[in-house]
């Protein structure tokens, strides 16, 4: 349906994205979609989705990246973009929850590992959703401690390379005077 609607509005970019696919759903959801899309592309057609999200936030980083490597290869064949979640997002979403603690903060070492395992775009296009204290849900002021400076630290440590990034759930975000923290 979305593809047909998009044809009527060529001046608007329409992109379809699968969001938050946890490990237990990969074999019944994202992997079959990527295989189907690779077949479509091989036959000269467009993929159904433009991007897919692998949410490895509940597994150890090395396992997360091993799965991400496999999915990135499939994503390249399907001409899609892979989004990976690095670190735990606090709060609750889709039946998964994480406490509000230090695990909510990705580290520069995490960014380096991502770049080492997935490359800097030469292996395929991906977005890395690093966590910096972001949470799902609403919280009283002061409960959520966002540390967006971590994103700059991660980028610098990952060989000063630009890795497409995404902010996963911005609950707790505040307006800064003059647009600066």
Please identify what each model-predicted range represents.
Residues 1-11, 23-165, 176-178:
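Alpha/beta enzyme core
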Residues 181:
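Conserved phosphate/anionic-ligand binding catalytic regions in large, soluble enzymes, centered on
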């Amino acid at each position: 349906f979305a593809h047909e609607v998009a044809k009527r509005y060529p001046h608007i970019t329409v992109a379809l994205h699968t969001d938050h696919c946890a490990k237990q759903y990969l074999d019944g959801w994202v992997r079959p979609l990527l295989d189907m899309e690779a077949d479509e592309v091989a036959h000269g057609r467009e993929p159904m989705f433009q991007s897919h999200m692998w949410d490895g936030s509940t597994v150890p980083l090395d396992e997360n990246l091993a799965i991400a490597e496999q999915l990135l290869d499939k994503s390249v064949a399907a001409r899609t973009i892979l989004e990976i979640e690095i670190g735990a997002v606090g709060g609750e979403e889709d039946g998964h929850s994480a406490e509000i603690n230090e695990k909510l903060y990705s580290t520069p070492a995490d960014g380096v590992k991502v770049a080492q395992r997935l490359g800097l775009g030469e292996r395929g296009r991906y977005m890395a959703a690093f966590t910096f204290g972001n949470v799902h849900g609403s919280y009283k002021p002061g409960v959520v401690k966002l540390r967006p400076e971590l994103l700059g630290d991660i980028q610098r440590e990952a060989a000063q390379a630009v890795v497409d990034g995404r902010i996963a759930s911005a609950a707790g975000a505040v307006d800064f005077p003059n647009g600066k923290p």
